[in-house]
From Swiss-Prot:
This is Uncharacterized protein YgiK. One of its GO terms (cellular component) is plasma membrane. Pfam families: DctM (PF06808). It is found in: Cell inner membrane. Belongs to the YiaN/YgiK family. It comes from the Bacteria. Disulfide bonds: none annotated. GO terms for molecular function: transmembrane transporter activity. Keywords: Cell inner membrane, Cell membrane, Membrane, Transmembrane, Transmembrane helix. Its main location: membrane. It comes from Salmonella typhimurium (strain LT2 / SGSC1412 / ATCC 700720). Signal peptide: none annotated.
């Protein structure tokens, strides 16, 4: 390839790395590096016009309305006492297993993540409740924190999931309903894998089981948590039944969560104002990131980056499974230093064409990509959930790494199963996704 074609690529990624290194927020790093790359091919006025146009077009999508609505619904759920009720339900369901509180943490994170759609919120809300309980029962603080950190991202695989909506946008319109359905089985499988690790660890360290509860107590706990659980069935049931679109489902989630907060009487006017402000800030950051990433996507396409990466990977091997392994390794590496949303926006346009050329379904590849990048949320140096979990558990990161290792092994096994057994992701969309 001639230097004149490589030059825009060098400028794009070189300036991106330099701008990030000096501490500029990733959103502006993406936008500026894209502009610098486009300036090589176009005059300044035209380059600015193109980048602004691509940002605007990238945000001009009805599906994107779901992001601020789901963010708001999640924030209402976080403050509305939902986590405590789900923890009580999880304890009632798995309390008799060895290491019951660890299993409770995993199950509560799975349920809460499925309702709030936020891994960070799950780690903070559930961890804030479970860490003191586990410490009181003699659990190692490092182990309890590791369990919370490893299980918090499960909610990103199960609807409502903003990262799956972002992937739908970055992939050119993959069905959000199909992606939502595709995440269920991998999410449940991840929870079971982590519970297996927790059971082995608990058996080895002789952790206690919870006291047995009677049917009346269980029904009381279940009744208390049922209104929260209904949100999951309302959202996915309405989408599958064709009653409403994923975007409309997000608005319904806000109305339902507000009604639930009013019933529970956990949110006052002051808290609601803070929730709205936080939701506006979070949504603005995400949507600005989406817009800038659309500009970078165009800059990469203009510089033939996807074709270059395709040639490099296929030159190593033409075997479908080997190429998929290479993509997985790259995504695992990317996840260690880049947050999940920008990683999806930047690397989906690069890797999805390769995956489609190999005959991999875009829905399946989306689940592979999201699962891969969620592991990065638990690893240094940029592991958001790792930092949140350690802050909640009041423990240093270096002490959590050792108990995290067997959990990472379990996650890698699940990742291999998701990659090489496509039906784990595609079974439910095939059966239930609306046409």
């Amino acid at each position: 390839m001639d230097f004149e074609y490589i030059y825009p690529i060098i400028v794009l990624f070189g300036s991106f790395a330099i701008i990030l290194a000096v501490g500029v927020p990733i959103t502006f790093a993406i936008g500026l590096s894209s502009l610098f790359s486009i300036l090589i091919a176009l005059p300044p006025d035209a380059a600015i016009s193109v980048i602004s146009q691509k940002m605007t077009v990238g945000l001009d999508g009805f599906t994107l309305l779901a992001i601020p609505f789901f963010v708001l619904a999640g924030n209402i759920m976080n403050t509305g006492g939902i986590a405590r009720r789900l923890v009580n339900l999880a304890q009632a369901l798995v309390g008799r297993l060895p290491g019951s509180l660890a299993h409770c943490n995993i199950l509560a994170n799975t349920l809460f993540g499925a309702i709030s759609g936020s891994a960070v919120a799950s780690a903070a809300a559930v961890g804030g409740i479970m860490s003191p309980l586990q410490e009181k029962e003699g659990y190692s603080p490092a182990f309890s924190t590791a369990i919370n950190v490893a299980s918090a991202p499960i909610g990103l695989m199960i609807p409502p999931s903003n990262v799956l909506i972002v992937y739908s946008l970055a992939s050119g319109g993959t069905s959000v309903a199909a992606l939502f359905l595709a995440g269920y089985l991998p999410g449940i499988l991840t929870a079971l894998a982590l519970m297996t690790v927790a059971a082995l660890y608990a058996h080895r360290h002789h952790y206690p089981v919870a006291e047995r509860i009677n049917l009346r107590q269980f029904l009381s706990v279940f009744r208390d948590s049922l209104p929260s659980l209904l949100l999951i069935f309302i959202i996915i049931g309405g989408i599958i039944g064709g009653v409403f679109t994923p975007t409309e489902a997000s608005a319904i989630a806000v109305i339902y969560s507000l009604a639930l907060a009013a019933i529970y009487r956990e949110i006052n006017v002051s808290k609601l104002r803070d929730i709205l402000l936080d939701s506006v800030v979070t949504s603005s950051i995400v949507l600005l990131l989406v817009g800038c990433s659309m500009g970078m996507s165009w800059a990469m396409t203009n510089a033939d980056v996807p074709e270059l990466i395709n040639e490099m990977i296929t030159s190593v091997s033409e075997n479908k499974w080997v190429i998929l392994l290479i993509i997985n390794l790259i995504l695992l590496f990317v996840g260690t230093f880049m947050d999940i949303t920008p990683a999806i926006l930047i690397f989906t346009p690069i890797f999805l064409p390769i995956a489609q050329h190999l005959g991999i379904d875009p829905v399946h590849f989306g689940i592979i990509m999201v699962f891969n990048l969620t592991i990065g949320l638990c690893t240094p140096p940029v592991g958001t959930i790792l930092f949140v979990g350690c802050s909640i558990g009041k423990i240093s990161i270096d002490k959590v790494v050792k108990p995290l290792l067997p959990m990472f092994l379990a996650l890698f096994v699940v990742m291999a199963m998701i990659c090489y057994f496509p039906q784990l992701s595609l079974l439910l969309p095939t059966l239930f996704a609306p046409s």
